[in-house]
Amino acid sequence: MTEKPRIFIVSDSIGETAQYVVDATVSQFNGYLDSKRFSYVQTTRELNNIIKKATEQKTLIAYTLIDPRLREEIATLARKNNIYAVDIMGPMMEAFEEFFQKKPRLQPGLVHRLDKDYFKRVEAMEFTVKYDDSNDDRGVKEADVVLIGVSRTSKTPMCIYLSYRGYKAANIPLVPEVEPTPLIYENPDNKVIGLTIDPLLLNEIRQERLKSLGIDPESSYASIDRINVELEYAEKTMEKIGCPVIDVTNKSIEESANEVIDYLNG
């Protein structure tokens, strides 16, 4: 059995709640783990199949199962097979039941009911994917927020986080050789926000990125001289726009994104 660890996410609904908790936790360990999501799990047979797959490789199971019988079943199966399993929602539901003296509805997927806010988030996510790393005027015009910055300043993950919160987020890379759309200098509705980062940290991030792609980490893209040129260009561009600037150095995606939200709600 290979020892490369991975995570199974098991849910009787979509599994977004468990996925979000897992992603937030993984980010605290500065690493990446393979994960596989099993959605709409409703039967013991499905649980048995998942457990069987989990035994083939070092696996941690994180689950959100509303049905107490399924929660008990997966916990039992995991113990029998020496698999580490984490119940994300069960303890909270039990605490609520005891504290409020009320029985839960035990209906999977209630948090994702098709209401106005849900459709707003879906629309925002679709928008963000469409205008990721884009220099398109339409993205600037239609976005709730436009993030600008040099490569590897967390523009894309921040936009994804913002879209999950219902904001149409676009991002534009700043590269000295490519002039951004003139529309950002007009900064309509004060929606443009700049991102910056410590050059030495950016150097490390870019080198790691190149290594992961099998490219020489000493290439010009990751050189400190090139990084300083890009950051200087980005700083001048942001000054010309007159937009707020967020330093993302050593900050989590959530922390930086919430600073963006604070600016938007200013």
Swiss-Prot record:
Enumerate the UniProt keywords alphabetically. Answer: Kinase, Nucleotide-binding, Serine/threonine-protein kinase, Transferase
Q: Is tRNA-binding among the key words of this record?
A: no
- Pfam families named among the record's database cross-references: Kinase-PPPase (PF03618)
Catalytic activity, EC? 2.7.11.32, 2.7.4.27
Q: Which residues form the signal peptide?
A: none
Transferase among keywords: yes
One GO molecular-function annotation for this sequence? Answer: ADP binding
Q: Identify the residues that bind ADP.
A: G149, V150, S151, R152, T153, S154, K155, T156
Show the stretches that span the lipid bilayer: none
On the tree of life, the source organism's domain of life is: Bacteria
Catalysis performed (reactions) = N(tele)-phospho-L-histidyl/L-threonyl-[pyruvate, phosphate dikinase] + ADP = N(tele)-phospho-L-histidyl/O-phospho-L-threonyl-[pyruvate, phosphate dikinase] + AMP + H(+); N(tele)-phospho-L-histidyl/O-phospho-L-threonyl-[pyruvate, phosphate dikinase] + phosphate + H(+) = N(tele)-phospho-L-histidyl/L-threonyl-[pyruvate, phosphate dikinase] + diphosphate
Give the function comment from the record.
Bifunctional serine/threonine kinase and phosphorylase involved in the regulation of the pyruvate, phosphate dikinase (PPDK) by catalyzing its phosphorylation/dephosphorylation.
| Family, as annotated | Belongs to the pyruvate, phosphate/water dikinase regulatory protein family. PDRP subfamily.
What is this protein's record name?
A: Putative pyruvate, phosphate dikinase regulatory protein
For this protein's source organism, the top of the classification is: Bacteria, Bacillati, Bacillota, Clostridia, Halanaerobiales
